[in-house]
């Protein structure tokens, strides 16, 4: 059996990037032989193994044959007679179809090194058209490698147009699209804009297509403050200007987690309260209530800090109101709900409206509305 370093790790090394993970392909081996050599299988229906010492992933070389629609519609062959070139040929782009053997020799049957040097994203083979996810991955690589300014090969653009006509993009799952979106957070504007240029955005992310202009420009995502943020923060910073009425649709489309959704919703509420000159006290009350930033002090603090971070990155926005006044308002409301009312003396059917009016009066006073 022979081992080859493949895929993104090789690409990144050739670009001068330290790879986060290293994936290996094994040629000339069976599953039983891998187990006999101490490798640990990690997938029930897929021959992927963990090296007993390095803990890196090793997969048997494979070929693929299209049998049905969608991302999973493939027949896979893991025979020990599959060659390295067979395995590399099934990969999406030439820059991902390069291998390095155990003697550090680069094996590049599809001229991926030339495309790396010329900053071109080019499909490895005509099989590119068989997997609709590859269109999304192409946009993701353009975003992920945005510092290198890759362009897409003309013949690949032509192939993508053919793929779109087949309707295959409609078979992509939200789970897979979420994974690609998160991986594209290095520069999501490039990710979505590339999909738009490929005429795929309206098919894959129709709601994002409607609010694309509200996502910051690509220079926003090149700011060190953004780059140093965690995934939860990056998602919120990217989508902070999404209208409240579109938020639930965006959540479903991007398959945002509860954590993502709560943080984004609270941050959007804070943004609107501080920036909207014409907002009313009742609208502010509904925003802070729906975003749960009265009860959840940690959520309020995290969202407010994230909004401050947004202002530092996007220095063209000047809030109409001081965030410290909002902080004082929230604290006053919390204390008022305990101290300013004798709840026992208020009829139950009037308690909710009485509390609501108290909060609105506090908002008016504190924010000078």
Curated annotation (Swiss-Prot):
It catalyses: a tRNA precursor + 2 CTP + ATP = a tRNA with a 3' CCA end + 3 diphosphate; a tRNA with a 3' CCA end + 2 CTP + ATP = a tRNA with a 3' CCACCA end + 3 diphosphate. ATP binds at residues 8, 11, 91, 137, 140. Keywords: ATP-binding, Magnesium, Metal-binding, Nucleotide-binding, Nucleotidyltransferase, RNA repair, RNA-binding, Transferase, tRNA processing. InterPro entries: CCA_bact, NT_sf, PolA_pol_head_dom, PolyA_RNA-bd, tRNA_CCA-adding_enzyme. GO terms for biological process: RNA repair; tRNA 3'-terminal CCA addition. Mg(2+) binds at residues 21, 23. Pfam families: PolyA_pol, PolyA_pol_RNAbd. Its cofactor is Mg(2+). The keyword Metal-binding applies. One of its GO terms (molecular function) is magnesium ion binding. Its EC number is 2.7.7.72. The keyword Metal-binding applies. CTP binds at residues 8, 11, 91, 137, 140. It is an enzyme of class 2 (transferase). Belongs to the tRNA nucleotidyltransferase/poly(A) polymerase family. Bacterial CCA-adding enzyme type 2 subfamily. HAMAP family: CCA_bact_type2. Catalyzes the addition and repair of the essential 3'-terminal CCA sequence in tRNAs without using a nucleic acid template. Adds these three nucleotides in the order of C, C, and A to the tRNA nucleotide-73, using CTP and ATP as substrates and producing inorganic pyrophosphate. tRNA 3'-terminal CCA addition is required both for tRNA processing and repair. Also involved in tRNA surveillance by mediating tandem CCA addition to generate a CCACCA at the 3' terminus of unstable tRNAs. While stable tRNAs receive only 3'-terminal CCA, unstable tRNAs are marked with CCACCA and rapidly degraded. A single active site specifically recognizes both ATP and CTP and is responsible for their addition. This is CCA-adding enzyme. It comes from Francisella tularensis subsp. novicida (strain U112).
